[in-house]
Amino acid sequence: MLNLHLVEASIANLRRGLEDGTVTSVELVGAYLNRIAHFDRHGIALNAVPILNPNMFEEAEASDRRRREGKTLGSLDGIPYTAKDSYKAKGLTVAAGSPAFQHLTANEDAFTIARLRAAGAVLIGLTNMPPMANGGMQRGVYGRAESPYNKDFLTAAFASGSSNGSGTATAASFAVFGLGEETWSSGRAPASNNALVAYTPSRGGISARGNWPLVPTMDVVVPHTRTVPDLLELLDVIVADDAETRGDFWRVQPWVQIPKASALRPASYAALPLQGALKGKRLGVPKMYVGKDEGADRPIETRASVLDLWRQAARDLEALGAEVVEVDFPVVSNYERDRPGARTMVDRGLVPAEFAEREIWDLSIWSWDDFLRANADPAIPDLASVDGAKIFPQPPGALRDRYGDADFDLAQYVERAKQGVAPLADIPAIEAGLKGLEATRRIDFEDWLDANRLDAVVLPAVADVGPADADVDEASAMLAWRNGTWVANGNLVWRHLGIPTVTVPMGTMADIGMPVGLTFAGRAYDDVALLTIAGDYERATRRRTVPPRTPALADDVFEGRGAASRVGDAHLTLALTAETTRSGATDEIAIALETGDAAVVKVHVNGEPVSLQGSGNRFTGRVIVPATTHQGFHSVWRGSYGSIVTAIVRSPDGRVGGAYTVTGGIG
C-alpha cells in the first residue's frame, strides 16, 4: 500500500486512498480541519474558511458507511471541498460576506451544492469574500483571506477577486477543491495568485441557481482546483441540466436563447484527451498584456517577472505545436474605448445608452430581491427589509475604493426596493441590452477570431499583484488599483460578453514568490475545446508551486494499511467537550472525550496532536496555550476565533468516527 500525502493530494489520490483502505472520509475531514485550525484560524491566520459545516463528520461517516456497503454514490463520494460564502448550503448561513446577512440562513442547497451532496462529496465550510462579492480584497463581515505564498501580497486582485477565500483554501490544501464565483475577475484573479486552475463557463454552462447574485448578466460559478484533471472530475458532477430556472438569470430571461448544459458537455470530461490538443492551434496574444501596446490611453504596466514567465509560456506553447501570434485586441479596446478610434457598444448602437444604468440598478435590485424571496427566511424576507447601512460598511482606517463612476453605496438598493421592485419583463432596455451583448461578442471577438484564423487567445492572467496593505496605504493602493492589477486582465469583458476562459498556472515570479496564471479564452459554447488546450499546456508544464507558508503537518501523511478485515455496522458514538479557563498570560483547555466502544483515539488542538489519559471509554487531558491564541483579530464585526479541538476514533473492528468542538472564542 502507498502512503497518502494530504498536501497537494488530487481527487484521484484521495479516492484511491479511500478505496484501498488507507484512509476514511472521516479521517480526511479531520486532517483538513486540523490544517484549517493550524494555518487558517491561528498561526499565520490565513482566514480563508470562516464558516465551518457542523455536520461535516456526520456526512463523512455516512460516506464511509456507503463505501463499506458497496453503495458509493460516484467518484467524489467522501471527497472534502469548500464553497464560497455566497453559495446556499441548507441550514448554513449565506451572508455573502456582508454584515447585513450574517444570520441569513439558507433554506436549500444551491444547484452545485446539491449536485455534490448527491454525489457524496463532503462540505468542510464556506470561504471568505468581501460584502456581496462587490470587490476583491475589501474586508467583509469575516475579514478577508491572506496569501499562503507571501504575506506581503494579496491573495487576489483588490478590485475584483472576491473568491479570495476559495483561492487561498484550495492552494493551502484546506480541501481538495473549492467553488468560487466571478462577475468581473473574482474567480480568475485568486486562481492566478494561488497557482490554481479556474474555469469561467459560457452562459448557462453551470447553473448558478442558489448563489447570491451581484450583476446577473455577468455572474458565473467558478470551480477552483489545483490541476486540470481535478477540474474535469468536478465538472462531470456539476455540469448538468437544471430543471429549475429561478435564480439563474440567463436561463430565466426569455430573449436570448442559450444551449442546455447537456448540449455543451461531453459524455465524460475526465475522459477528454488532453495530450496533443495544442498541436496545430493558432493562438493570439494581445499585445496590450505583454508590454507591447502602443496608443492606449491607460496602458497596462506588466511586471518584468510576469513578462519573463510569459516568454517561457510562449516557448512552451510553441514546443507543444501551437503557433503564437501577437495581436491587437478590439474586443477590449472597443469595450473600454481605451484609444483613439475605439467605439463602444453604445457608440455603435449595439446596446441602448440606458442599458448600463438599468443593468446595475433595476436588474440587480430585482435579482437580489428575488434571491431573498426565494430563500424565504422570515427574518429577511425581501430586499426592502434589509438594513442597507450594513450591506457594505467600511472598516475603520480603510481607504476609499477607486471605482470612479462605477462606485456607489449598495444601501441605495434597499431604498429603491422600498419604492417598489420592477419585474424583469418591465425593466426598460433589458431585452435590447442582452441582445446587444451577444452581438458585440460575435462582432468584436468571434468574427475577429475568424478573420485572424485564431483558435483562441492566450494571455498572462494579471499584470502584477497588489501589496497586502493596499487597503490602508496610499502608495500600495496606487499599485493595486493600476490597470492590469486592479482586476485580472480582460477586466469586465469576458463576463459581460459571455466569453469562456480557463486559467492555469504559468509559473511563480522570481522576485516576489507570487504565482501568475495563464488565461485561455475562446468562442462562446466551445468550452470543451478550450478546456483541452488549457489542459494540454498544464499537463506538459506543471508550473504550479506549493505554498511555502502552509507545509505538511505531522499527521498529514496516511500510511497504507489496507481495508479492515472485519468492519462493524453500528454507528461509533463519541462525545467531545472542551472548556477554556483564563489564567494570566495563558489559557488552559480541558478536554473530555467519551466513546461508546473501545477505540484508538487521536486528538488535536489547533492542528497539534495532544495526549489524553484514558480510563475505560473516557479520555481526558489539558492543554496550555498562550492567551493570545484567543485574542486574534480578523474582523471588526466579530469576536476572536476559538481553538478547534478535533477527535478521530477508530474501533478494533475498523469503524471510524470523528467530532470537533470550538472553545475560547467563536467557531
What does each of the following model-derived ranges do?
Residues 72, 200-308, 541-577, 585, ...:
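A short helix-breaking turn/cap at a secondary-structure junction
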Residues 7, 87, 93, 248-378, ...:
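Gly/Ser-rich, acidic/histidine-flanked active-site/gating loops
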Residues 42, 73-219, 249-254, 286-288, ...:
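Short glycine/serine-rich loop/turn segments
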Residues 223, 504, 514-523, 531:
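Short, well-ordered beta-strand elements
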